């Protein structure tokens, strides 16, 4: 049975401790970006599940400078525990959807902070022009740069329903160009999307096993107030996963994943004041404890059912 310290999967915490020699925390930053799915280039309503905060509901205020955002969050986190190293995580909206000189300014400012050891950027694969790729490769030579791509699913019918706005070939092209610059790529997937059963979700996992990715986020579908997804939910067009269904699904995904892929998330944090369903998702610690307990009982671990092609 494979284990990574105390966990039956290749956790981000394990990877960070190996790379940096101690526990490392992320500080969620707001670069003041928008998204082509919101500003009219592709659409105006965003992805069907996306909140008004653009998935950055826990990020700092864009009214503050990058340095001020980092310092504010470090002060808050360091009051609870001794921490010396942090990852600057640009999370809200699409964090390469801006002129390259603006991106150079904010990313360089983040990496120049003495307590920041790496940069993580959430974006879309259709927002990575050649000039931005050159910038990211340049920054990656100074400190590690990770790029998180929101794939969600490989299935085109689901992608159309959630208004993802790009083809799978676009993802593959962006991935190849990022890896040519030795930039680590994290893929964001959503479990529980309408029309996505276990087999379809595992098809996405099997596809990602064949790609040159370094990390993955397994995100539970959250129905958030004010989204178009919430309107469909309230019409009874789909139901959300219950807790046991979700844990079974996560275990399946982990068992089928390559053991080298780092697990950046196995559930998710939806803002409690916006969460409509599933309400059990707000008890994140309880969900994680149950997942670990169930995996131990079943002798389950990442890669258990992975078969190299």
Feature map (PLM): residue ranges:
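Conserved C-terminal portion of the radical SAM core fold
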Residues: 169-228, 244-267
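Auxiliary Fe-S-binding modules of radical SAM enzymes
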Residues: 2-14, 18, 23-25, 215, ...
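Short, electropositive alpha-helical surface patch
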Residues: 104-108, 137, 197-214, 270-292
